[in-house]
């Protein structure tokens, strides 16, 4: 009987579950587990059996699947976060903190427009946001010193030591999304908790780090392929394989004395729930959205990703990051100057982005509100840092360099108090003038929203506990 059961778990080749490593692309599926022997038959764990059973699903292996949920945990609340990551670092002066009274080399080429908040002006290329700014909070005093274009940036981890150029441990600091995945989990057992969309480079998003690769984000770029059943594998056959794995329970109880199998049960059920349940597959399928809704968002890639993010949180994902970039490397918003391709300067580089962003963010907020999702969904728009208060850096006449001393960002939703501006920069937009907001404050606000206790810790490679928020508190003006 054992031989018959195991003969159905056909051998395959698959990628290593630790995608930070290389050189294991041809590892046998059963090689991940230590076998036990019974009557001369090699008997593998239930996890191995299900791994082989599901491995034909367009590359949707069990290691990939088990990254989608947090220890089998499903959150009791429906809270979620959508992070629109403006990769490269948008200019504060040319977006949400204009300086119209200053010389052109400071104020830049754009005009300003009034908003729904009396006395508050923003860039002329954000008219839709200006008209509904009462739904947003602008923060004009974010202190993002130490941040740079690197994996697990300071602004996605809230760890001020997160500078890989000087700190080799920086890549291990877990991101907001990974911590939410571990300590909040998904809002539905068949949905991944932490998803990244439109990822142009690994350096644009935050990873699991010390938490482990199981808390890395699920790459939504590949979702359409991952959830396709290959020819010859029907849902009935997949369900039969699930029954097979359950039949293996009795056998493995006799031969596995390590206790590992009990822990693996949740991995197996997670994999089957996500594939066979159909909920995740349906969530990633934009063709199921009414045409009028798709038309409302539009055909731009960022708009499609925003619609997809709404579908994901609506169906149970708890943290979705959209990489708002058209490029790899440092990112689309890295507007150093027209003579520094491919990003351009403020006029030729930033200006075309703003109307697209304006449409995407306002459509998303309106749609979430109309569906009753906005109070449970915190939407955050930000990049790594601000940009220099003076035009003409690095030999250009129309670009701005990195400037971590002050940054602007915006938030909406989450049941917080909006229709306000928090903090202020100085007259040139180069320094914080009042109410500094730190990455730790932002992290504490996210975890407060998601119900993750601020005294939660994770363990580093030396076995030492580290607080998820070392310095910071929820932004009081929002609460």
Residue ranges of each PLM-predicted region?
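Ligand-binding pockets and gating/stacking loops
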Residues: 2-479
């Amino acid at each position: 009987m054992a031989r018959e059961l195991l003969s159905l778990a056909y051998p395959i080749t698959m990628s290593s579950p630790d995608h930070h490593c290389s050189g294991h692309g041809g590892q046998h599926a059963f090689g991940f587990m230590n076998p036990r022997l019974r009557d001369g038959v090699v008997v593998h764990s239930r996890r191995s059996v299900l791994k082989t059973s599901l491995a034909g699903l367009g590359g949707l292996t069990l290691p990939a699947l088990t990254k989608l949920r947090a220890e089998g945990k499903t959150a009791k609340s429906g809270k979620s976060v959508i992070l629109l990551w403006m990769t490269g670092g948008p200019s504060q002066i040319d977006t949400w903190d204009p300086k119209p009274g200053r010389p052109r080399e400071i104020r830049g080429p754009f005009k300003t427009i009034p908003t729904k908040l009396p006395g508050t002006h923003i860039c002329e290329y954000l008219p839709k946001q200006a008209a509904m700014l009462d739904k947003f909070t602008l923060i004009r005093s974010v202190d993002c010193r130490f941040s740079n274009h690197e994996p697990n940036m300071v602004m996605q981890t809230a760890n001020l030591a997160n500078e890989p150029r000087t700190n080799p441990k920086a890549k291990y600091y877990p991101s907001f999304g990974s911590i939410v995945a571990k300590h909040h989990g998904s809002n539905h057992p068949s949905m991944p908790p932490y998803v990244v969309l439109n990822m142009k480079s690994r350096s644009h998003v935050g990873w699991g780090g010390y938490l482990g690769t199981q808390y890395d984000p699920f790459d939504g770029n590949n979702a359409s392929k991952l959830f396709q059943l290959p020819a010859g594998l029907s849902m009935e056959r997949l369900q039969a394989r699930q029954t097979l794995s359950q039949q293996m329970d009795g056998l493995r109880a006799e031969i596995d004395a390590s206790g590992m199998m009990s822990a693996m049960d949740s991995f197996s059920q997670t994999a089957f729930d996500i594939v066979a349940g159909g909920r995740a597959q349906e969530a990633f399928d934009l063709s199921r959205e009414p045409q009028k809704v798709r038309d409302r968002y539009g055909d731009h890639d960022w708009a499609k990703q925003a619609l997809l993010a709404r579908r994901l949180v609506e169906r149970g994902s708890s943290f979705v990051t959209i990489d708002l970039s058209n490029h790899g490397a440092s990112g689309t918003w890295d507007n150093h100057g027209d003579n520094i391709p491919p990003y351009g300067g403020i006029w030729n580089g930033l200006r075309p982005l703003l109307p697209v962003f304006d449409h995407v963010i306002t459509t998303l907020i309106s749609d979430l509100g109309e569906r009753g999702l906005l109070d449970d969904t915190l939407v955050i728009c930000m990049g790594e840092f601000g940009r220099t208060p003076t035009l003409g850096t690095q030999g250009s006449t129309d670009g701005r360099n990195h400037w971590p001393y002050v940054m602007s960002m915006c938030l909406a939703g989450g049941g917080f108090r909006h229709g306000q501006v928090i903090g202020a920069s100085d007259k040139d937009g180069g320094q914080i003038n009042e109410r500094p907001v730190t990455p730790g404050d932002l992290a504490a606000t996210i975890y407060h929203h998601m119900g993750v206790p601020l005294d939660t810790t994770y363990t580093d490679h030396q076995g030492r506990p580290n607080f998820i928020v070392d310095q910071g508190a929820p932004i009081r003006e929002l609460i």
